[in-house]
């Protein structure tokens, strides 16, 4: 189990409270699909993913991105208990969707980039360290069913 200090929790929740989940969610998932194009195979039903502009303008990418970031919000509420909080999502992604768990790490890295671009100077090395710890712990929790 990952332990978050009070300072790390404060760093994460402070930025998260300012996050536009709808906007950043589409941006995060869109960036994942553009930077790591092999991840597109999990989104066959999303329609046109033929170019970066098509991906970023795709309403299904935006909607699912919002859903993904909403689950990050759940992670923030359950920072001390991530594996149980993500048990159902882990099962879904493992048993039904057959998503390579490495993709969870890639999404976490994209999340950190999105935070850095949105928050600039507020995204200090200390804040980044707290977020890296969180996205890594979320990736581990999502991959839990695979082990």
UniProtKB/Swiss-Prot annotation:
Function description: The epsilon chain is a beta-type chain of early mammalian embryonic hemoglobin.
Organism in which the protein naturally occurs: Pan paniscus
Summary of the tissues where the protein is detected: Red blood cells.
The entry's keywords: Heme, Iron, Metal-binding, Oxygen transport, Phosphoprotein, Transport
Taxonomic lineage: Eukaryota, Metazoa, Chordata, Craniata, Vertebrata
Domain of life, per lineage: Eukaryota
Keyword Transport: yes
GO biological-process terms attached to the record: hydrogen peroxide catabolic process
Gene that produces this protein: HBE1
GO molecular function (one): oxygen carrier activity
Family: Belongs to the globin family.
Protein name per its UniProtKB record: Hemoglobin subunit epsilon
């Amino acid at each position: 189990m990952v332990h978050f200090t009070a300072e790390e929790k404060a760093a994460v929740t402070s930025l998260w409270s300012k996050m536009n989940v709808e906007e950043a969610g589409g941006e995060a998932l869109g960036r994942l699909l553009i930077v790591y194009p092999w991840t597109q195979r999990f989104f066959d039903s999303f329609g046109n993913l033929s170019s970066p502009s098509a991906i970023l303008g795709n309403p299904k990418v935006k909607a699912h991105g919002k859903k993904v970031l909403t689950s990050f919000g759940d992670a923030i509420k359950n920072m001390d208990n991530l594996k149980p909080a993500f048990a159902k999502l882990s099962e879904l992604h493992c048993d039904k969707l057959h998503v390579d768990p490495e993709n969870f790490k890639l999404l976490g890295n994209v999340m950190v980039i999105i935070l850095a671009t949105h928050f600039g100077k507020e995204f200090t090395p200390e804040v980044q360290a707290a977020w890296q710890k969180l996205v890594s712990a979320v990736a581990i929790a999502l991959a839990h069913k695979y082990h």
